[in-house]
Amino acid sequence: MAAKEVIFGDAARAKMVEGVNVLANAVKVTLGPKGRNVVLERSFGAPTVTKDGVSVAKEIELKDKLQNMGAQLVKEVASRTSDNAGDGTTTATVLAQAIVREGMKYVAAGMNPMDLKRGIDKAVAATVEQLALIAKPCTTTKEIAQVGAISANSDYSIGERIAEAMEKVGKEGVITVEDGKSLNDELDIVEGMQFDRGYLSPYFINNPEKQTAILENPFILLCDKKISNIRDLLPVLEQVAKAGRPLLIIAEDIEGEALATLVVNNIRGILKTCAVKAPGFGDRRKAMLEDIAILSGGQVVAEEVGLTLEKITLEELGQAKRIEIGKENTTLIDGNGQAINIEARVKQIRAQIEEATSDYDREKLQERVAKLAGGVAVIKVGAATEVEMKEKKARVEDALHATRAAVEEGIVPGGGVALLRARANINVKGDNSDQEAGIRIVLRAMEEPLRMIVQNAGEEASVVVAKVLEGKGNFGYNAANGIYGDMVEMGVLDPAKVTRSALQNAASIAALLLTTDCMVAEVAEEKPAGGDMGGMGGMGGMGGMM
């Protein structure tokens, strides 16, 4: 086991604070509408340019192990805030640095770190209560656009795209971000339910221009087994042919003579059909087939429920107004399912989301809810170069998280004003003078986001903070244009969840740093420089070769 270095007291804390400052100073240059970019080196390809706090934080590793511990703890603040609220990572880092900086003065003066921590916790709890009172619901498309724009570093076109997407697919809908093919941002709305499986044979195509198969008013046969024998399918094919309507078959797989017969019937115009593999794998495939069945008003042909292909009637088949099948996607529009059944299914999936342990499972379940309840919107990000594309895409994703957070917990005035207004209404007392000091640490740190925004805009922070404190309510300073006024009216809004998460996470990690009194790190081994190779002995004469 490698030797360890153990450092105590002020020396340990001083090293940690150095690490905190290196990371926080790199992150905080990005704060506010006039924040600067940070360029991140890549081992191959072009460097990445970003204004996203957590992206900068994740890149930083310091050579000094003790400093690095401090930096990694603040990195945790940014990461946790990003996970909880999707934005506010820079604000959280700035708050953490301010709490650590103020707190270290009191620790050095001999105050009890544990009492300081209790005071910090009391102040944070009181502030969170006040933020909830200040917050107002975010309901209008305009407010959603403003929140998105502020989060995307004052890019109003991004805010408008996100608001438009939310309006189209609803608050439950899935909004995904993809690389675009042009210079402009585009928004694609997929109505109805879409899943990522296409036609099994190009012979099903009936729209050569779009290379898709379009079925109007079709029946839908859902089966959780492979279909290879045409005899199994004949009874249902005859019933559908009599009804004179097209048929979409979704099964685990369709192969051999079954697929060949369907293709031949389709080409000859006897029965308009299309065959598609069921989406997903394993248990998720069964669940998604069930979703499609509920949406289309049909039943899944499965042995567990006593249904076989030979026994099935038209009543068990699903129906839809229109289905479009492409090479890779199938879209089911206006299914025949009953609203009450769809709502019950959505409720059931939501209960599963509550119990889901992994992020991947949760994401997949949310996708299923969206496909049943809302729809799917795709924002295609346009840019001139790949570097710009990556930077812009990261901002769009941030803005998307921020708007979701705003819809969830409401909005507060932005630009660091919400924390100052919450601070003005806090009436909390500590049990002793050390706890009182802990409360003062947090109250002082709450000015820091506004100070940093103003500093990055090239103005005098103390003057602006004093003027904002003179005002009331939503009165604040808009750093984008240097105007004082009502932040909500000017469209400078923050999601309450983002501000709350930033403060809670910053205080949590900062309090841990303040209560640290010992650090243990591996001793860096000094590797001796490699000496030159000794002269190699001469090779003996080689015997004569035969």
From Swiss-Prot:
Enzyme class of the recorded protein, top EC level: isomerase
**Superkingdom assignment:** Bacteria
At which positions is ATP bound? 30-33, 51, 87-91, 415, 478-480, 494
**What EC number(s) does the entry state?**
5.6.1.7
As for what it does, the entry says:
Together with its co-chaperonin GroES, plays an essential role in assisting protein folding. The GroEL-GroES system forms a nano-cage that allows encapsulation of the non-native substrate proteins and provides a physical environment optimized to promote and accelerate protein folding.
* Keyword presence, Cytoplasm: yes
What Pfam families does UniProt report for this protein, alphabetically?
Cpn60_TCP1
Q: Which reaction does it catalyse?
A: ATP + H2O + a folded polypeptide = ADP + phosphate + an unfolded polypeptide
Q: Which UniProt keywords apply?
A: ATP-binding, Chaperone, Cytoplasm, Isomerase, Nucleotide-binding
Kindly list the residue ranges recorded as spanning the membrane.
none
Recorded GO terms, molecular function? ATP binding; ATP-dependent protein folding chaperone; isomerase activity; unfolded protein binding
Localization annotation: Cytoplasm
**Listed GO biological process terms:** protein refolding
* Family in the record: Belongs to the chaperonin (HSP60) family.
Its assembly, as annotated, is: Forms a cylinder of 14 subunits composed of two heptameric rings stacked back-to-back. Interacts with the co-chaperonin GroES.
Name the HAMAP family on file: CH60
Q: What is this protein called?
A: Chaperonin GroEL
